[in-house]
Amino acid sequence: MSAFDNATLMITGGTGSFGSTVLKHFLESDLKEIRIFSRDEKKQDDMRHELQAKHPDTAKKVKFYIGDVRNPQSIRDAMPGVDYIFHAAALKQVPSCEFFPMQAVQTNIIGTDNVLHAAIDAGVKRVVCLSTDKAAYPINAMGISKAMMEHVIYANARVAAERGGTTICCTRYGNVMCSRGSVIPLFIDQIKAGNPITITDPNMTRFLMNLDEAVDLVLFAFQHANPGDLFIQKSDASTIGDLAKAVQQLFGDTGTNIIGTRHGEKLFETLMTREERLRSQDMGHYFRVAADNRDLNYDKFVVKGEVHTMADESYTSHNTERLDVEGTVKKILTTEYVQNALKGIPNG
């Protein structure tokens, strides 16, 4: 028997790429109800019509709640009867957050705190929150807000565990291919328009994972988490230059135009810091970074003289397995978006 049988799952930011993929995964499950919580009524209406057209028998288990994680009351109103939450609501565009950093604070930090407080008060059993590799050694506003979000998660997880209630954990992603606002759809659109691909820096490296892998990571965290745990998938990486060549190999070569890095971009991303590797556990396809459950009484650690040796290096898109162009082609072909684009099927 699955933990999801006859349960109610709420997905914040549920009309986004991740929420749509989770919905497909669970539509035929024995979940009693799936609650889509988001602030965009148009996307909710589009999703509702698509469900009714394609899945008329199971669409009735999906309920829509208009609200904003910034508004605590709207979250509390959607919370009664919820067993589990996947918290995906976020501002995630790096350049936009650079220009409007307080908006990232309001959604990514305060919004997450609102969700977790409401979940704890409502007796939700388990919450899995979604973070990003940009939270590790952050240099931009989005990454800083997500790093603070992670610490909000750990603090709330500690409080909830002390009360013996909600289990709260976190997942950290690399680049989720073909999610909204990501670069592969932009490359495809540029090629179809006959324009050159715009590349920031061909030597940049990024982790690559598809949306199904993103859902699998959340489900693994759901099944294995202790309070405050962080879960990371072992991921392949590619240079932006090779990623562009892979897309051109599939859709045609219209040339490239190197435009330079955008606001707040890194040469490479970090999924797990040296400091986190100290507390990490290799779980096969994933790493678990256990919560740091020390309290503020540091004297006992000094008196006992506990010493931990730091890991040699972080886990980054520069030192993970690097895909060549052919490997990158195979990787991006695992996405439904690219498969549809090759067939001429419009992507929503």
List each language-model region with its residue ranges:
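N-terminal Rossmann NAD(P)H-binding glycine-rich loop of SDR-like oxidoreductase domains
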Residues: A7-S29
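Conserved Rossmann-fold NAD(P)-dependent oxidoreductase catalytic core, especially the SDR/UDP-sugar
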Residues: H87, L91-A147, A155
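Conserved Rossmann-fold cofactor-binding substructure of NAD(P)-dependent oxidoreductases
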Residues: K63-Y84
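Rossmann-fold scaffold of SDR-type NAD(P)-dependent oxidoreductases
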Residues: T12, M79-A88, C129
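Hydrophobic/aromatic anchor residues within beta-strands of the central parallel beta-sheet
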Residues: F64, A104, I168-T171
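Strand-loop microenvironment adjacent to phosphate/nucleotide-handling motifs in alpha/beta enzyme folds
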Residues: V115, A155-G348
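Conserved residues in the N-terminal Rossmann fold of short-chain dehydrogenase/reductase
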Residues: S38, Y65-I66, Q106, D201, ...
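Conserved glycine-rich Rossmann-like NAD(P)H-binding loop of the short-chain dehydrogenase/reductase
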Residues: D30-D46
